[in-house]
Every structure is written in structure tokens, then in C-alpha cells.
A protein has these predicted regions:
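Chalcogenol-based redox active-site neighborhoods
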Residues: 1-160
Length: 160
């Protein structure tokens, strides 16, 4: 997938999306500073989204928080290009303390390595990436239409 749409308006991604069976390593930033995917052990789900203060991104991140409660054997990571401050404010406003949310704004490694990035608007696309304990991509699902929620049923099937 090299294109995404927002309300049917096409946008080019930064390149061809990363593929299954690829090792994904990256650093990002969280409220404590530098955050590294390699510090997280076990199976992981990365939930990527464009902007936390929008309706669909809000719903997606809250749904991920629910899934994290149901699937304790999986680490759920939410990532966007929002600033850490904006992410923290959102979490505080929603009362969500169990959400692992990181920012790709400073280091830009996630967007560079996955190409799940829309340069024209400086936002990530929407979707999920499932990693095994070695950080090898097992499944990937990126939305073509960003104004729609991702496929939670597919994600739930993957992690069972």
C-alpha cells in the first residue's frame, strides 16, 4: 500500500509499506524520554494512528486500552506523531493510565522504517502491526481510508 485516503481524498505514503517477516526496531519518545521497542519483551501489537485528538484516533486508542486489559500476554503500543505532551494530556483527560503510548515526532524512526507515514500532513496512517518476541512482523494491516476505524475483529483473531 502506497496511498491512503482521508474522507476519500488521496494522499501518498512515504514509500512502500514494510512487509511481513521483517524485523522492526525503532526508538521513539515517551513521558520518560527515549523509548525503545527492543526493551519490550514478548508479543507486541503496535497501533498506529494519525492524531490523538480526533474522534477515530480517540476511539481506536480507547479500544486498544480495552484489548490490553483482555490480553495480558500481549503488549499493546500506540504510536503517533503527536507530541508527548499532547499524548499525556489526552491520557489524563481520558483517565487512561494503562496505555503505552509513544511519539514518533522527535526521532521519526518508526515512520522511516515502516513507510506508514503521510509526509504531506506529517501524520502516520492508521492500522496495526503484530510483532513476535523477536520483533519480526507477523501481521500488518494498514487502513486505506483513515476516517474509518481499523479492523478490531482481525486484530482480535491475530492475538488469540
Amino acid at each position: 500500500m502506497e496511498k491512503a485516503k482521508i474522507h476519500h481524498i488521496p494522499f501518498k505514503l512515504s514509500g512502500p509499506a514494510i512487509e511481513k517477516n521483517t524485523k522492526l526496531t525503532f526508538k521513539a519518545e515517551d513521558k520518560n524520554g527515549i523509548w525503545n521497542i527492543e526493551d519490550i519483551k514478548g508479543k507486541k501489537v503496535i497501533s498506529l494512528f494519525p492524531a490523538i485528538n480526533t474522534k477515530i484516533c480517540d476511539m481506536q486508542t480507547q479500544q486498544i486500552a480495552k484489548l490490553a486489559q483482555e490480553h495480558k500476554n500481549v503488549t499493546f503500543i500506540s504510536i503517533s506523531t503527536d507530541s508527548v505532551k499532547k499524548q499525556e494530556e489526552w491520557c489524563a483527560a481520558k483517565g487512561l493510565e494503562n496505555v503505552l503510548i509513544v511519539s514518533d515526532d522527535k526521532y521519526k524512526e518508526f515512520q522511516t522504517k515502516t513507510n506508514a507515514y503521510i509526509p504531506r500532513i506529517n501524520k502516520l496512517t492508521r492500522g496495526f502491526i503484530l510483532l513476535d518476541k523477536e520483533n519480526i512482523i507477523q501481521e500488518i494491516s494498514l487502513n486505506i481510508e483513515l476516517s474509518k476505524e481499523p479492523n478490531y475483529t482481525l486484530l482480535d483473531k491475530w492475538i488469540k
